[in-house]
From Swiss-Prot:
Main location: cytoplasm
Enzyme Commission number(s) from the entry: 4.3.2.7
SUBUNIT field: Monomer.
Taxonomic lineage of the native organism: Eukaryota, Metazoa, Chordata, Craniata, Vertebrata
InterPro entries per the UniProt record, alphabetical: ChaC, GGCT-like, GGCT-like_sf
Listed Gene3D superfamilies: Gamma-glutamyl cyclotransferase-like
Biological processes annotated in GO: glutathione catabolic process
Top-level lineage group: Eukaryota
Any one of the GO CC terms: cytoplasm
Catalytic activity as recorded in UniProt: glutathione = L-cysteinylglycine + 5-oxo-L-proline
Protein name: Putative glutathione-specific gamma-glutamylcyclotransferase 2
Amino acid sequence: MWVFGYGSLIWKVDFPYQEKMVGRIRGYSRRFWQGSTDHRGVPGKPGRVVTLVEDPEGCVWGVAYRLPAGQECEVKAYLDFREKGGYRTTTVVFYPKDSSIKPFDVLLYIGTRDNPNYLGPAPLQEIAEQIIDAVGPSGRNTEYLFELANSMRNLVPEDVDEHLFSLEETSKGTPGKRTKPKLPLE
């Protein structure tokens, strides 16, 4: 079983895997439209993390992970818990960056529009301010944004994810409320 990562699964790999491969899926675009009250924000002050939205012309680069033989159910159960908060799973075709490898199916987690944490579209500046101000049990929301952008630049320099990179630039240039939010007590 293969799982596709397009957000924190790209840079925060805390599960066992047998193999990983850079590639893309088609028919979607990555957007910071999913609220996070369990990882990058808290109830009443959610952070924003990525989900995918259907886009016939879209292409999302990421990393596919092959789960270890005999541990698929255990690792999937862990990922189901990690990706809680409104995500559903579906299967899509993955196109490896290495074109000598044939496309294959991967499991994909998507935050749906009808889930309680879905925030939807907003002006880029508003999304940036929300990310700057949010912090949750997994850390600052800006860490999530900046790690994802850096990872995509390193893995796929040719990627032109305008939403991701514009949001990164806007967040770095937003003076706003740059006070350090207090981390939740553990």
